[in-house]
């Protein structure tokens, strides 16, 4: 590849052209995610509403983030997503920041690894960089791009890549092992594949030990970490998801397909839509078989270097071991999971970990060419020119697949538009709810909480306000345990969603306690909504908004807002009362003041209607 370039341009220009070309996949991913991102809660990601609602209602417990889900304890994923949701009112668009950081952070690790193994001042580096870039940003893993929940996989990949970078390039430095162990813990408590990284590192270091039969000190360190992490992870975990498991042949077919999908998909992109799972496994199975054969051949060549703990050899063994463990473990659970069977190995999301088998060989071959381990006479198939030609063929095929893959991102874009339209006001089920989540009760709970808390697709919506007319200010009434204040009003429109009123603090800094409010439709036994306001946090004459469940047909209906407090008048929050005017509504009713029965006072109340 560089040989052809050098006949037209100088080697230096060719070098930088290839480096620039390596940035194209990264830019492609940026545009692809921006165009195709699902920007509303979808499928398993909707379960985050339970933690968000608990946080808003004051019922959140940190221990709940530890709960298992699909053979994982996604503590890191839940923590990051919850904190982001709290900060942004669950604006799903903001979650892609963390997805970008994970993917580009992983690329930074792989670039640094290429610099350590190959160096920058040679023609092999840009070829290696281009190959790695095409694999990492590959649209074959599109499922990990257009859905923010796949931050779980992307973050795990980053933590694993960082761990491998540290321990394989500096295998004798304890500080690197400590940082890598922390990173592996984070990976394990994001997705189960983090445990496979523990095992891959242990095996690699034990194979590279001076005496194979004697435990290596670094391997022992990682074994201890694995055991402690497992002791924290496994209790209470339901590991069985299916009563049937694959046969040896099915497991082999799945694993080969899983390992070959990253390469096979780049040679010829197989997906036609975002949810399609190709049924044919032939191409990926062949690619997986070829990669295993080449890995075995390279491993034999690398074994003497592994005993010396050469970084390239350790990368080859560690990457391959991790990919194989991921393939077999996933196949054990998924090869007979549903009607797709072993074709589940073609799943787009799995390629993120299956690609390590290919990446390890790319790095090892690159290091071998730079350091001249193979003479062209003895290893003609691995001669520099042959490798560059193969890399050029791979790059051309991959760029074609990148172009063909845009249809998947376009499909995701259209799906997101349709999905967003499903989030209409109200709780009446619509046929499109099945796209949000397969369980109707889960969709109903999700929409109810989102509308009540005004989160996600129901956040920052436009509201129509109607303010009750009042006269001049008369006096405050104390919201203490001594009285209840009731105000009736008639809704002027459909879609009642908010009530706004003002409080005063006649007791100043002494204000404490809680104000309890409840809204009911007159004549109904069940309240529409209720809540608490911390009196100590209220500001003098500041507007307080009470959020309600969306009321579809509210126009013309009469509602009653009841307010009460705790404690004594001397520490209570105040509610300003006004003289009525001709167009004022019904007067307030004070439980301890008979004069109010004669219409002496009204409260200022603003009703807001969602549209």
Language-model regions, residue ranges each:
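Short hydrophobic/aromatic helix or loop-helix immediately within or flanking a transmembrane segment
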Residues: 64-89, 253-265
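Intrinsically disordered, polar/acidic, low-complexity terminal segments
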Residues: 5-71, 85-128, 174, 203-205, ...
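Hydrophobic alpha-helical membrane-interfacial segments at the cytosolic entry of transmembrane helices
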Residues: 213-234, 317, 389-390
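Membrane-interface alpha helices of multi-pass inner-membrane proteins
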Residues: 176-203
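Membrane-interface transmembrane helices that cradle and orient dolichyl/undecaprenyl
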Residues: 160-177
């Amino acid at each position: 590849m560089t040989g052809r370039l050098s006949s037209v341009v100088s080697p230096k220009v060719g070098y930088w052209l290839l480096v620039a070309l390596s940035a194209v996949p990264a830019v492609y991913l940026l545009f692809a995610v921006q165009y195709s991102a699902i920007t509303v809660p979808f499928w398993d990601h909707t379960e985050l509403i339970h933690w968000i609602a608990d946080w808003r209602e004051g019922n959140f417990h940190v221990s709940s983030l530890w709960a298992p889900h699909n053979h994982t304890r996604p503590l890191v994923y839940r923590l990051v997503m919850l904190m982001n949701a709290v900060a942004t009112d669950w604006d799903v668009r903001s979650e892609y920041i963390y997805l970008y950081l994970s993917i580009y952070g992983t690329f930074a690790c792989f670039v640094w690894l290429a610099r350590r193994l190959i160096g920058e001042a040679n023609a092999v580096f840009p070829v290696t960089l281009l190959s790695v870039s095409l694999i990492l940003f590959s649209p074959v893993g599109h499922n990990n791009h257009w859905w923010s929940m796949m931050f779980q996989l992307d973050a795990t990949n980053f933590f694993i890549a960082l761990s491998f970078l540290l321990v394989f390039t500096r295998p004798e430095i304890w500080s690197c092992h400590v940082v890598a162990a922390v990173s592996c813990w984070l990976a394990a408590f994001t997705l189960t594949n983090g445990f496979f990284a523990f095992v891959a590192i242990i095996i690699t270091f034990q194979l590279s030990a001076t005496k194979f039969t004697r435990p290596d000190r670094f391997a022992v360190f990682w074994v201890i970490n694995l055991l402690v992490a497992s002791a924290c992870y496994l209790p209470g975990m339901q590991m069985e998801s299916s009563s049937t498991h694959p046969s040896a042949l099915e497991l082999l077919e799945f694993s080969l397909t899983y390992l070959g999908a990253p390469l096979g998909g780049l040679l010829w992109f197989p997906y036609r839509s975002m949810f399609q799972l190709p049924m044919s496994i032939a191409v990926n199975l062949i690619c997986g078989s070829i990669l295993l054969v080449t890995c075995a051949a390279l491993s034999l060549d690398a074994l003497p270097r592994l005993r010396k703990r050469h970084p390239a050899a350790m990368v080859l063994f560690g990457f391959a071991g991790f990919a194989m463990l991921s393939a077999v473990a996933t196949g054990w659970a998924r090869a007979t999971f549903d009607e797709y069977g072993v074709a589940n190995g073609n799943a787009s999301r799995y390629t993120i970990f299956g690609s390590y088998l290919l990446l390890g060989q790319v790095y090892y071959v690159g290091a071998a060419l730079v350091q001249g381990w193979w003479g062209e006479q003895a290893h003609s198939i691995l001669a520099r020119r042959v490798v560059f030609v193969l890399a050029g063929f791979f790059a051309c095929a991959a760029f074609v697949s990148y172009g063909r893959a845009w249809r998947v991102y376009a499909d995701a874009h259209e799906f997101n538009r349709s999905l967003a339209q499903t989030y209409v006001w109200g709780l009446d089920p619509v046929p499109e709810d099945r796209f949000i989540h397969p369980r109707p009760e889960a969709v109903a709970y999700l929409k109810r909480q989102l509308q009540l808390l005004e989160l996600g697709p129901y956040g920052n919506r436009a509201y129509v306000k109607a303010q009750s007319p009042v006269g001049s200010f008369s006096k405050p009434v104390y919201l203490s345990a001594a009285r209840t204040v009731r105000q009736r009003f008639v809704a002027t429109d459909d879609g009642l969603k908010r009530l706004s009123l003002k409080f005063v603090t006649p007791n100043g800094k002494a204000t404490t306690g809680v104000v309890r409010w409840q809204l009911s439709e007159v004549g109904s036994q069940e309240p529409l909504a209720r809540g608490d306001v911390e009196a100590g946090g209220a500001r003098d004459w500041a507007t307080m908004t009470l959020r309600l469940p969306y009321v579809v047909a509210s126009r013309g209906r009469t509602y009653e807002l009841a307010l009460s407090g705790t404690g004594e008048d001397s520490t209570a929050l105040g509610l300003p009362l006004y003289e009525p005017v001709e167009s004022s509504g019904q007067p307030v009713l004070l439980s301890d003041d008979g004069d109010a029965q004669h219409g002496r006072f009204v409260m200022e109340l603003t009703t807001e209607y969602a549209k």
